[in-house]
Swiss-Prot record, chain A:
GO molecular function: single-stranded DNA binding; ubiquitin protein ligase activity; zinc ion binding
Main subcellular localisation: nucleus
Top-level taxonomy: Eukaryota, Fungi, Dikarya, Ascomycota, Saccharomycotina
Secretion signal span: none
Biological process according to GO: postreplication repair; protein monoubiquitination
PROSITE patterns, per the entry: SAP, ZF_RING_1, ZF_RING_2, ZF_UBZ4
Originating species: Yarrowia lipolytica (strain CLIB 122 / E 150) (Yeast)
Protein name: Postreplication repair E3 ubiquitin-protein ligase RAD18
ZnF locations on chain (UBZ4-type): 146-174
Family the UniProt entry places it in: Belongs to the RAD18 family.
EC numbers, comma separated: 2.3.2.27
SMART domains named among the record's database cross-references: RING (SM00184), ZnF_Rad18 (SM00734)
Length: 344, 169
């Protein structure tokens, strides 16, 4: 079953065992999967958006790697790593297969192509030229660069950012649609605000849950935790390059409730002896106890009778066996069991 | 995995197990007790050389919470252990197994606590070095702590006794 879980150890026995480190670096330290919507912390460590948000809301306000203080608002997208993961994971299976096949056959030595100084020079020159053009291109088309809105963190072209801010982050107006409508018809997902348990009323949280189409049952604590997890799941989804549908996120929330929350609630309630007045308890449940005692007596009696019967049969059997064999060990065993039964 | 999609905890533990068996640390063996439930592991730890625990082979269990790796597992020796940092019921008291925030003995700095970047092999290695170097500042077994501080000879004697017991001698 282990072969279908890709992990860095797959590279260990291959010719490219160094790729183990590459593989490891592209994985989140929390879930050990390739980064999904990687976010970089203020201290420079990268985690999946969902993993780090969950950790910072539920466990500790410190970076898991270096223990420096850390807040969700400090997290930023790590776009380069996201692209890197995308390309590496797309090629991973192929590289692994090729490398493992190659391990079976001797690899022909790689011969460096001879390089002439002239060619080298030419290459370098053309390289410089290309860099320059790129630079000017970037300058000209700076309006096409995607920038993050400082208010709602939506990504939009530089040209649209001012209008976006003027409209209070609301681009759904007739004019605002032109930069959106050309490529995608879906509007960009927006992050939602966390609620503060100290300042937010329960009714408000209930309404928010209702607005999102989520369950509003449970105690105050449950409602707050549910909304908190919803915010975590939702905001992590917004960080995703290809966000999943709302119903998918709802499924995730449901799964979280059935595994994590249900398990916490399943812990046995501690019953302290102080809470119980034992005389009252005995009186209240006298009938039940009487019934149980009677049942227990009956079953003991029944077992005894059965065992006695068995013993009698065994004794007879043993008698025959002993007659036939001289080995008297089974006889000793029998007397041991007999002794045990007298006690019970 | 009970028919459903494995949870984050299950998935991560599968990976840890796979990595563990591909590159096992010396003197330690560990794995899920049952391949359908990755939340309970059994492990065997060899007593480190040049310590009273030398030559011993100590069985223990690791119980992982549903929200692993956000919260740490609980480690419990299933044989008799005499050690300042192991409770009499076998539960190991070591900073790497304490989540930041709960500090039963008020002495641990946040940097040596549990964090999701830790893993099973790191826990077991820490436990092994804990066997070699008890920390008498955090007494889980007060008697053993005192004995270790005041009467090393007697301490070694008792430990050797538990080692023989664990080996079934």
């Amino acid at each position: 079953m282990n072969s279908d879980i890709p992990d860095p150890s797959d590279w260990i026995d291959s010719k490219l065992s160094g790729l183990k480190d590459v593989d490891e670096t592209l994985r989140c330290h929390i879930c050990k999967e390739f980064f999904t919507a990687p976010m970089i912390t203020g201290c420079g460590h990268t985690f999946c958006s969902l993993c780090i948000q969950r950790y910072l809301t539920n466990t500790s306000q410190r970076c898991p790697t270096c223990m420096q203080e850390q807040q969700i608002s400090q997290l930023r997208k790590n776009v380069t790593v996201e692209t890197l993961v995308e390309h590496f994971s797309a090629q991973r299976a192929t590289i692994l297969r090729v490398v493992k096949e190659a391990a079976k056959q001797p690899i022909p030595e790689v011969v460096e192509p001879p390089s002439s100084p002239d060619l080298d020079d030419g290459r370098r020159r053309s390289g410089r030229k290309r860099t320059r053009t790129n630079y000017t291109e970037t300058l000209v088309s700076s309006d096409d660069i995607q920038v993050e809105c400082p208010v709602c963190q939506a990504m939009l072209p530089g040209a649209a950012i001012n209008r976006h801010l003027d409209n209070n982050c609301n681009d759904t107006g007739a004019n605002g649609g032109n930069w959106l409508g050309t490529k995608k018809k879906t509007k960009p997902l927006r992050k939602i605000q966390r609620v503060n348990q100290a300042s937010e009323s329960v009714a408000n949280v209930r309404r928010k849950l209702q607005d999102e189409g989520l369950s509003t049952s449970g105690s105050k604590q449950t409602l707050f935790r549910r909304y908190d997890e919803w915010v975590t799941l939702w905001n992590a989804n917004v960080d995703n390059k290809t966000p999943r549908s709302k119903s998918d996120i709802k499924d995730d929330l449901r799964r979280w409730e059935t595994t994590v929350v249900a398990n916490e609630n399943a812990q046995p309630v501690k019953m302290t002896i102080k809470n119980i007045d034992d005389r009252q308890w005995v009186q209240k449940h006298k009938e039940d106890y009487d019934y149980l005692i009677e049942q227990a007596r009956k079953s003991i009696l029944k077992k005894k009778q059965e065992k006695e019967k068995e013993q009698q049969q065994q004794q007879e059997g043993h008698q025959k066996a002993v007659d036939r064999r001289e080995d008297n060990e089974p006889d000793m065993k029998r007397s041991e069991t007999e002794g045990y039964q007298v006690v019970s | 995995m009970s028919g459903k999609r494995p949870s984050v905890a299950q998935k991560r533990l599968m990976k840890e197990y796979k990595q563990f068996i591909s590159d096992p640390p010396q003197g330690i063996s560990a794995g899920p007790a049952d391949e359908d439930n990755f939340l309970l592991w059994e492990c065997l730890i060899q007593g480190p050389d040049d310590t009273p625990y030398e030559g011993g082979l100590f069985p223990a269990t690791l119980k992982f919470p549903q929200d692993y790796p956000l919260s740490p597992p609980v480690m419990k020796f299933t044989c008799e252990m005499y050690h300042p940092n192991i409770y009499k019921d076998g539960t190991v008291c070591i900073s790497i197994l304490h989540a930041p925030g709960d500090d039963p003995n008020m002495y641990e700095s946040a940097s040596e606590r549990w964090s999701p970047i830790q893993s099973v092999d790191k826990i077991l290695l820490s436990v092994m070095s804990m066997l070699a170097e008890p920390n008498d500042e955090s007494g889980a077994n007060i008697d053993a702590s005192k004995m270790w501080r005041d009467d090393q000879e007697q301490f070694v004697k008792i430990v050797r006794g538990t080692v023989r017991k664990a080996l079934g001698l």
